[in-house]
């Protein structure tokens, strides 16, 4: 009888200890483009004032779309820091690289600065192996407002959250390059 109780107790304890779930934390990498800024200073100033995300993206969980209408917010695959901060930091890094002669910052730089605000409405993986990044940005250039929508897709070549985050970062970098091209056209 004692052997039976010891066996049950051992199985119960083993079941309790193996129920541990690992949490994974993700940080967007800064995707390096072919363009490199040679100047660390410039006479043109750009303040990336904010990057906003909707409530469903503002939580800790990485978002995955499982059907046309259903989204899952992961419980164990989490952003290492708030997504809006990661998007803003990587945008500043990418624009700094792609805009020689500009000082790009996430803090106000002075009164004669251009100001960029971005609203991201989608930033997720999808059931068909694609990732979606969409939204709009608004640039205040010397009192002139320039507003552009964006919607980009990327394709995962492998399964998993690691790949999804890398592809999302690459697509976000593409949008940063697009914004940089628009800014370069300014007088």
Swiss-Prot record:
Name used for this protein in its record: Intermembrane transport lipoprotein PqiC
Organism: Escherichia coli (strain K12)
Keywords: Cell outer membrane, Lipoprotein, Membrane, Palmitate, Signal
Gene Ontology CC entries for this record: cell outer membrane; outer membrane-bounded periplasmic space
Biological function: Component of a transport pathway that contributes to membrane integrity.
Topology within the bilayer: Lipid-anchor
Domain of life: Bacteria
Pfam family, one: ABC_trans_aux
């Amino acid at each position: 009888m004692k052997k039976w109780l010891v066996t049950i107790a051992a199985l119960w304890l083993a079941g309790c200890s193996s129920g541990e779930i690992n949490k994974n934390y993700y940080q967007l990498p800064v995707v390096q483009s072919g363009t490199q800024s040679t100047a660390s200073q410039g006479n043109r100033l750009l303040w990336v004032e904010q990057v906003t995300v909707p409530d469903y993206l503002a939580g800790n969980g990485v978002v995955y779309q499982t059907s046309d209408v259903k989204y899952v917010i992961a419980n164990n695959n989490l952003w290492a820091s708030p997504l809006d901060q990661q998007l803003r930091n990587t945008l500043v890094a990418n624009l700094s690289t792609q805009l020689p002669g500009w000082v790009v910052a996430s803090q106000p730089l002075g009164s004669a600065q251009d100001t960029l605000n971005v609203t991201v409405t989608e930033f997720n993986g999808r059931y068909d192996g694609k990732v979606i990044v969409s939204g709009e940005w608004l640039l205040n250039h010397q009192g002139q407002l320039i507003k552009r929508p964006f919607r980009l897709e990327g394709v995962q070549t492998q399964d998993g959250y690691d790949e999804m985050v890398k592809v999302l970062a690459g697509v976000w970098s593409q949008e940063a390059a697009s914004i940089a091209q628009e800014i370069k056209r300014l007088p």
